[in-house]
Structures are given as structure tokens and as C-alpha cells.
């Protein structure tokens, strides 16, 4: 057996990336954003092809991400922010609902969304993870944008029965 294997592609040239950053826990979000933008540049994404918007908090990420995804102007999106545990149940609500919204947007629109919302117990944990998570999200966005493009069905106007692009060379005899 010789399967067709798509390898990770971290070439960001020509990609359009949208970033939505939650302003709550501003210092953490800024560190994430800076690391994310630096990594996107290293991966070849032109700064003119990146749009950054900010929203008040993690629960508002979904609305902005949905609007950006629905515009189909972006190859991938990135959500950045931090939810730090407090003394109430609010932490669980914000963590769960923001993660669910991010996943739902990606699945419903087919636009990859890298989830960079940190969910941590302390400010120190968030600070320690912020830059790394921002850079990771840049890599995830580029890789998933390229994967989504590679998996996009090609329109073949000339011959719908052309099987040159099939993964296996065996003819289907209808059985």
C-alpha cells in the first residue's frame, strides 16, 4: 500500500490571515499578538495580508470571527486572548463558550480558526504561555490554510470522468 500523504506546509506566502484579539487581560493579549505577527512574518505572510481586530473579551471573539469567516476574504483566522480563573463559575462559562464558538465557526464555514485563547489558573501562567501560544497559532493558521486549500475539490470543466488525479490507479469497475 502506498498512500498519498499530504505533508505540513508552513509557507504563508499569498495567504490572507484574520486575527481577533480579546482586550480583557490586555498585557497577555498584546504579547500573544506580537509573537503571532512575528511568526506570520517568518512564515512568509505579508503584513498587508493580515487584518487585526480587537473585541472586549473572549465571549465576543465568536461574533468577529464569524463575520470575518463569512466574508471569505481570509484563508485562516486566529483567536487570541486569555481567560484567567477567578473565584466564581464565570471562568468555566467563558472558557467553554468561547472555545465552542471558535470550533463552531471553523466547522460551519470551513475556514480554519486557530484557537489561541489561554485558559489558565493564574496571571503568571498566562504570561509564561502568551508568546508561545501566539507563535503556535500563526503556525497552525498557515498549516491549516494550506491543508484546506490542498483538500479543496478541483473543478474540472473539461472531463468529469478524468481519473488522472485519483489517489489509486485502479479502475472502478462498478462492483
UniProtKB/Swiss-Prot annotation:
InterPro entries per the UniProt record, alphabetical:
LS, LS/RS, LS/RS_sf
| Amino acids binding (2S)-2-hydroxy-3-oxobutyl phosphate | 87-88, 129
List every stretch annotated Disordered. 150-175
Assigned keywords, A-Z = Riboflavin biosynthesis, Transferase
Q: Which domain of life is it from?
A: Bacteria
What pathway or pathways are given for this protein in its record?
Cofactor biosynthesis; riboflavin biosynthesis; riboflavin from 2-hydroxy-3-oxobutyl phosphate and 5-amino-6-(D-ribitylamino)uracil: step 1/2
**Cross-referenced CDD domains, in alphabetical order?**
Lumazine_synthase-I
Its recorded reaction(s) are: (2S)-2-hydroxy-3-oxobutyl phosphate + 5-amino-6-(D-ribitylamino)uracil = 6,7-dimethyl-8-(1-D-ribityl)lumazine + phosphate + 2 H2O + H(+)
State the EC number(s).
2.5.1.78
Q: Name one GO molecular function term.
A: 6,7-dimethyl-8-ribityllumazine synthase activity
Q: Where is the composition biased (Acidic residues)?
A: 152-175
Annotated binding of 5-amino-6-(D-ribitylamino)uracil, by residue = 24, 58-60, 82-84, 115
| GO BP terms, alphabetized | riboflavin biosynthetic process
Give the active-site positions: 90
Disulfide bridge partners, by residue number: none
Q: Family per UniProt?
A: Belongs to the DMRL synthase family.
Q: What the protein does?
A: Catalyzes the formation of 6,7-dimethyl-8-ribityllumazine by condensation of 5-amino-6-(D-ribitylamino)uracil with 3,4-dihydroxy-2-butanone 4-phosphate. This is the penultimate step in the biosynthesis of riboflavin.
This chain belongs to the protein called 6,7-dimethyl-8-ribityllumazine synthase
Which gene holds the coding sequence for this protein? ribH
